[in-house]
Amino acid sequence: MNHIYKLKSYGIGTDRRFYGVANKTLETPDFLDPVRESFDWFLHVGIPEAFDRIFPIVSANGKLEISFRRGSLRVEKPENEYLAIREAKIKGKTYSARVYVTLVKVHSEDGEMEEQEILLAEFPFMTQGGTFIINGFEKVVVSQLIRSPGVCFRENVRNQQADDLFNKVEIIPQLGSWMEIFHKVTGNQVDTVKFRIDKHKNIPLLSFLRAIGFTNETVRKYFGNSPELLESIRRHKLESLEENLELIYRIVRKDDRITEEGLKNLIPSIIFNERRYNLASTGRFMLNAKLNLVERISQTYLAEDLVSKKNKILFKKGTYITRQLALEIQEKFNNEEIPLSEIEGVDSTIYARQLEITRNENLWKRFYVAIVKVWPNKKSMLQESEPVNVIATDPNLNEKTLVLSDIIAIVSYYFNLLSNLGKSDDPDSLVNKRIVSVGELLQNQFLIALTKIEKNSKEKISTKSDLSQLTVKSIINNKPIYNQFKNFFNSSKLSQFMDQINPLGEMASKRKVTSLGPGGLNRDTAQFEVRDVHTTHYGRICPVETPEGQNIGLILNFSVFSRINQYGFIITPYYQVKNRIVDYSKVHWLAASEEFDKSFAQSGVEIDQNNRIIPDKLTVRKNQTYLVLDAEQVNYIDVSSMQMTSISASAIPFLENNDANRALMGSNMQRQAVPLIKSEAPLVATGIEEAVARFSATNLRASISGKVTYVDAKKIIIDDGEKPEIHYLRYFEKSNQETLILQKPTVKVGDKVKKGQLICDGPSTDNGELALGKNVLVAFSTWYGYNYEDAIIISEKLVKDDVFTSIHIQEQTIKFRSTKAGNDILTAEIPNASAKSRLHLDANGIVIVGSEVDTGDILVGRTSPKGEDNPTAEEKLMAAIWGKKALAQKDTSLRVKNGEGGTVIDVQILSRDQGDNLEEGVGMLIKILIAQKRKIKVGDKMAGRHGNKGVVSVILPVEDMPFLEDGTPVDIVLNPQGVPSRMNIGQVLELHLGMVAKKLKTKFVTPVFDGIKIETIKKLFDEANIPESGKFKLFDGISGQAFENPVSVGYMYMLKLLHMVDDKMHARSIGPYSLTTQQPLGGKSQNGGQRFGEMETWALESFGATSVLSELLTYKSDNIQGRNLLYNNIISGGKIPSPGTPESFNVLAYELRGLLIKLEVHKNDQENQEVEEIKDPLELPEIPSNFIDEYNQDGRIELNKLEEFADFDEENIDFDKLTR
């Protein structure tokens, strides 16, 4: 019996059965395009924009000007990207490009001009894969999600200190001071409205309005008579402009002396100066969008006629304004059909001051606003009560700073909210958040550096008396740019070491979005609301993929189809629907703000051949809720069922059947799957695997169309008839996480290829599809308790057949230095080294490539001069004359570290003689790469794709594994108790479908939210002759008896994760101690011990294990003398000493002494068994002298001063003496 399906082709000739509903889905875009486009923007728009902001640089006396010649920018990058990147990785360099620019120097006195092209900067250049190579390591610049510049109105916001609620508006620039207007809405009294600049003290709003030229009459005229405003006017006593300016000056510039010039420039410099206050294009767009009329006049009644320029009544008084009508009215203001009103009654002194600073003549035109008088409701219209003024800003503004009409519109909106006009904003919505991507982050760094260059240049010019001698090159120093970029890439939180375990991890790290970093949130203070999933995330940010732990909800991932528009807002695609007909010809990209009042249907809606929606009623998304509407009311439809999720989450089959918490774990763990020796694509896929493989940077695509003329393990040559193109393959390269990067050709000589076609399989790729794990036969059953608590039982077959074997590459380096005592020598003649350890060295003393080395074997032979022989000049002379024997040498060879044995695959030698750039005092550096084959073993972590993770607890012989009726032994036994409470049913469905796939010798594709339904799986059971329950009779391999009940058995896709026991296993015999506590350090990297804490001590106490406890808390912990004595006695074979006082007890003793508490120490004398009382409280067991010094540095009491207080009289204490 055959259920209806389509056969879809994926990768290189893999056909999969598709049972979904979705009719047409949008082709997945190149996932790395946003990153590349952003860097491209930086090169072609960002850099020239930065130049325009800083240049021309004019000297203080105005005699010299340096300007930038437009269009002269030239970026010079390395010719062959592959070879340049390879060299950068081997030699630890940065893959960078040079920026040349032509600057013009003009001497105003004689009009002399000098033009010169200079090398302005050398900065890291992005690779094709969207990464940067910094000092030989691949790094990624992560996009940042921050509050968008603009204006944000909020009602009833809780104050964190008190329990009061506030109304407030925040004015957020991209550069400059944040401003806030707010008042308290709780309490019995009406509160006055306040204004705040940055985090300074509150200023009455009236003071600010007065300072920019308003009078009380103008304030009432424009902003109405709300109780809060009248109370603010009543309480405000400062009348003149100067008094109000002085008040603001004292708060904002509290340490500066007040001058007349300072008062005049105060507000223009804070708000109106483009160099200090910049909204950027995004801020201006947001301001114009928020401060228009539409939101406030919708669903109100006109309180006056709206008249056109020609005195024609366009809208009559009393008209009810729908949203559609509000849009029409706004449009007429935009087109100036309805004239704007001039701002009257405002003293423009301060504003005129701004014109002097910016010399922007357009600003005189900015004295206009759009004013509409309305009644908020029908009752107020019928009573003809006083109408409310709704003031909108000039709709044609494009200034990057605030202007007067903005300020009036903001204050008007604030008071309109008290009349229930307008709506408050949600700061967590993507309407009010924007993405700062790579290009913009780099432009910000470039701007900071150019500002430093401007400052330095002005200083340089001012110190020179003869300006004619100065050249452009001598004035402009490019060091600040180099330092700024170096700083950013090496130490910024946004420049991260790339996750390179597998192609999925690499892709995810390039599409990561963080709310942390400069200008972002702080993980310690971020509230729950900020971390939560928001309705506007749909199609833009994945609701599933985020880290567990303190970064949850702060680090996110872009959804599959999301992109970023020119303002930095995330946009997502839809198909438009008109009268039930879906228009597939054009894709509409919408930002969150454009979704208001529109209804969106899912992609899985049934559609006929004429693209008409079949069902009459549909569940749709509209204004942040789900509604059931008629099909005619649908405006848009999703382009794909994967639209909501990120790449990792879209790779989980049956995601819709899993609990979100487990899906989150599944997404994160897929990124940790290590590439296996033989990759295998899943039997049950979701369809995104092909796209990941195609766009991954670890796979190669043909750069031209043509014929393959040459193929080997390291390169592929394609000829298009004009010029052969060489494609270099990556061969046995080490990734950032020490996994293997190896590309295998998938084309043969003679094949014809198209541009963009995959020509090789990289790590974790199988025939052009992502392949992170293996399809293995899994049974859900318990087995003698070995899979208790998520443990996993695996068959020895998986070890023998190298099913889960991976290759890992370790790098070991050694430096050869030149010191006063002499030079390090590379040699095969190593003193006191055994022949076995030198077995693999060549004549020069370097290990031979291909050698199998083990722990302790010598990789590079090196001898260094012994430190104590530091010869004087006379001794050197004597040695030269008499030819004394060479100075004593010691063995400092590079040996294989513990647990890092394997096959030597490469030796890289960097030498100063060959022109390599090495650090000071180093003449040569040798890197050895060792490849290790790791089979799966007990203690390794494994997982499925559904968040079902566990640790291998036992590897059973094949004959002991449970087997099916036909004798097939299962590969893995999982605990059935891991399913119900975790609610990740997807793994069970995958198991059954995997069994069907194996029986029918086919493969399935089941995209997220458009997957195979359970009814279909049941019908497929019939087709594959599988019992209806999907369960099989299973037999115990040891007893041969059948299990009591049938067991679910099928094929599941299992991954081996990077958390391997080889990297975790660790034991300490001797090792370092902490300087402060004198206890052993912790962790494998420090060769530390396992902390035996308070609860562990209780456990031993309860068994009365006194001797074990005694040595744990003394010798093995912090009894300094005891452990040294013990070590000596063990070596010399003496008697084990009795445990002494631990150091922590001494700390307690000092603490008590500092509190002047008398201590008595009773010593147990072995000879006469007498107890001796120590009269002097200072006569405690011996304490090391350095310990006292250390504690004194802590500001504790100096012990020698304590003797003065041995017989103290409480009334005559000089307490000052007790402190340092």
UniProtKB/Swiss-Prot annotation:
<dbReference type="GO" id="GO:0032549">
    <property type="term" value="F:ribonucleoside binding"/>
</dbReference>
<comment type="subunit">
    <text>The RNAP catalytic core consists of 2 alpha, 1 beta, 1 beta' and 1 omega subunit. When a sigma factor is associated with the core the holoenzyme is formed, which can initiate transcription.</text>
</comment>
<dbReference type="Pfam" id="PF04560">
    <property type="entry name" value="RNA_pol_Rpb2_7"/>
</dbReference>
<dbReference type="GO" id="GO:0000428">
    <property type="term" value="C:DNA-directed RNA polymerase complex"/>
</dbReference>
<dbReference type="InterPro" id="IPR015712">
    <property type="entry name" value="DNA-dir_RNA_pol_su2"/>
</dbReference>
<protein>
    <recommendedName>
        <fullName>DNA-directed RNA polymerase subunit beta</fullName>
        <ecNumber>2.7.7.6</ecNumber>
    </recommendedName>
</protein>
<dbReference type="Pfam" id="PF04563">
    <property type="entry name" value="RNA_pol_Rpb2_1"/>
</dbReference>
<dbReference type="InterPro" id="IPR007641">
    <property type="entry name" value="RNA_pol_Rpb2_7"/>
</dbReference>
<dbReference type="Pfam" id="PF00562">
    <property type="entry name" value="RNA_pol_Rpb2_6"/>
</dbReference>
<keyword id="KW-0808">Transferase</keyword>
<keyword id="KW-0240">DNA-directed RNA polymerase</keyword>
<dbReference type="Pfam" id="PF10385">
    <property type="entry name" value="RNA_pol_Rpb2_45"/>
</dbReference>
<dbReference type="InterPro" id="IPR007642">
    <property type="entry name" value="RNA_pol_Rpb2_2"/>
</dbReference>
<keyword id="KW-0548">Nucleotidyltransferase</keyword>
<dbReference type="InterPro" id="IPR037033">
    <property type="entry name" value="DNA-dir_RNAP_su2_hyb_sf"/>
</dbReference>
<dbReference type="GO" id="GO:0006351">
    <property type="term" value="P:DNA-templated transcription"/>
</dbReference>
<dbReference type="InterPro" id="IPR019462">
    <property type="entry name" value="DNA-dir_RNA_pol_bsu_external_1"/>
</dbReference>
<keyword id="KW-0804">Transcription</keyword>
<dbReference type="InterPro" id="IPR007121">
    <property type="entry name" value="RNA_pol_bsu_CS"/>
</dbReference>
<dbReference type="Pfam" id="PF04561">
    <property type="entry name" value="RNA_pol_Rpb2_2"/>
</dbReference>
<dbReference type="InterPro" id="IPR042107">
    <property type="entry name" value="DNA-dir_RNA_pol_bsu_ext_1_sf"/>
</dbReference>
<dbReference type="Pfam" id="PF04565">
    <property type="entry name" value="RNA_pol_Rpb2_3"/>
</dbReference>
<dbReference type="InterPro" id="IPR007120">
    <property type="entry name" value="DNA-dir_RNAP_su2_dom"/>
</dbReference>
<dbReference type="InterPro" id="IPR007644">
    <property type="entry name" value="RNA_pol_bsu_protrusion"/>
</dbReference>
<dbReference type="InterPro" id="IPR010243">
    <property type="entry name" value="RNA_pol_bsu_bac"/>
</dbReference>
<dbReference type="InterPro" id="IPR007645">
    <property type="entry name" value="RNA_pol_Rpb2_3"/>
</dbReference>
<comment type="function">
    <text>DNA-dependent RNA polymerase catalyzes the transcription of DNA into RNA using the four ribonucleoside triphosphates as substrates.</text>
</comment>
<dbReference type="GO" id="GO:0003899">
    <property type="term" value="F:DNA-directed RNA polymerase activity"/>
</dbReference>
<comment type="similarity">
    <text>Belongs to the RNA polymerase beta chain family.</text>
</comment>
<dbReference type="GO" id="GO:0003677">
    <property type="term" value="F:DNA binding"/>
</dbReference>
